[in-house]
A protein has these predicted regions:
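Extracellular loop and loop/strand-boundary signature of outer-membrane beta-barrel proteins
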Residues: 30-31, 73-77, 118-123, 156-159
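Residue-level signature of outer-membrane beta-barrel architecture
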Residues: 33, 47-49, 53, 92-94, ...
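Cleavable N-terminal export/targeting peptides
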Residues: 1-24
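Outer-membrane beta-barrel "beta-signal"
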Residues: 43, 139, 165-177
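Transmembrane beta-strands of outer-membrane beta-barrel pores
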Residues: 31-37, 47-49, 65-71, 108-114, ...
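Short loop/turn motifs that connect adjacent beta-strands in outer-membrane beta-barrel proteins
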Residues: 22-24, 50-59, 95-102, 141-144
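Residues that define the transmembrane beta-barrel architecture of outer-membrane proteins
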Residues: 37-41, 80-86, 125-131, 165-169
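Transmembrane beta-strands of outer-membrane beta-barrel proteins
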Residues: 25-29, 57-65, 84, 102-108, ...
């Protein structure tokens, strides 16, 4: 059941996505795997903040707005969480190889969690930082497709205790438009 908070959060996400539509974008779907039996999906929209030709052709800066759905446990003992995030990301192309581009990326953004207790952890606050570190490969005739492996860490940076953090690995497929 959607609560008023979830509707407000979804509205905020889609407003940020609509603002982003003025730029060329990229849509991404991620499979997420966390500690224990945690898994989920992440749907994201990305748009360039700094185009490669504005600076160094190997550097790209983009913003990502996303919605995450996480689940934990079995049908008898089930837990879920809904998360919206917005994050600037710095991407660096290491090499052009096999008709594609191998890149690495880092970013720190903000997230809003629906529930502060998830998968047996109390993360204290609905607001969390979303840290990421990833590697990926861009390919296709116009480099419009990308696959990536990323590590995500969510925490409140110690603003409130407890702060155990949540860690995830994701596999992503995206298409640029």
């Amino acid at each position: 059941m959607f609560t008023l908070n979830r509707i407000a959060r979804l509205s905020l996400l889609f407003i940020s996505m609509n603002i982003a539509c003025a730029h060329a974008g990229e849509i991404s779907a991620d499979y997420i795997r966390g500690e224990g039996d945690v898994e989920g999906i992440k749907l994201a929209y990305r748009f360039d903040i700094l185009k490669t030709y504005d600076f160094d052709p190997r550097i790209k800066v983009y913003a990502e707005s996303s919605v995450n759905f996480w689940k934990y446990g079995t049908p008898e003992h089930y837990d879920s969480n809904f998360v919206v995030s917005i994050s600037p990301v710095l991407q660096y192309t290491f090499c052009e190889c096999m008709e594609g581009e191998l890149y690495g990326e880092v970013g720190i953004g903000l997230s809003l969690l629906d529930d502060t207790e998830f998968a047996g952890k109390d993360v204290s606050t609905h607001y969390q930082f979303e840290d990421r570190l990833g590697v990926g490969y861009r390919f296709g005739e116009a480099q419009e497709y990308s696959i990536a492996l990323r590590y995500f860490h969510y925490s409140n940076a110690g603003f409130k205790k407890p702060n155990p953090g949540l860690d995830f690995i994701s596999f992503s497929f995206s298409k640029a438009y």
